[in-house]
Structure formats: structure tokens, C-alpha cells
Amino acid sequence: MAELRPNRVKNKLAAGLAATVVAGPHNAEMIEHLGALGVDGVWIEGEHGPIDYADIPDLTRACDLWGITSVVRVNLNLPGVIYRTLDVGAQAIVVPHV
């Protein structure tokens, strides 16, 4: 059976610690640089900015390589959009206009 990936942000918050989440990376290379700095999470902006849905799998894989939690803001508050975003690797979802 597949194992869930550790969610560094969730684990730190549950332990009462602060988590560092960086917003703005829009390519895997930027995420690799952040991974080397030890950030806990990356905010992938899917509502505003240059990120297209097709970019999300590569960005979440880059996060996985460094053990970084991928937090994705989806562009629509629709169950299908949220499910698909989780299916391609997002560990946390931010829903707009809620």
C-alpha cells in the first residue's frame, strides 16, 4: 500500500511551531533553490500569475524531491478542479473566494 508523503507544514503547525511557506515560485528550478534553503512549503499560485494547470505536476514533483509541502491555490471552487489538483500531487489546497 502506498504511503502518504509527510506534510512538513501540517506537522510543524501541529507541533506548535512556525512553518515557512514561500509564495511565488513558478518553475521547478526555483523550487529546487528553495529546497536547498530548507523552506517547509511552497505556495503555488494557480489563480493569479503565470502558473497553468499543466505546470502543477512538475512543480509538485520538485517539492516532493526536497520534502517541501506543495500548497496550491486553485482557480475555481469546484470539486472537480480540487480533486484533479490533488491527483497531480498537491498536498494542500487553498480555495479562492471562500
For each feature predicted by the language model, list its residue ranges.
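Expand to "…catalyze enediolate/carbanion chemistry for C-C bond making/breaking, isomerization
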Residues: M1-V98
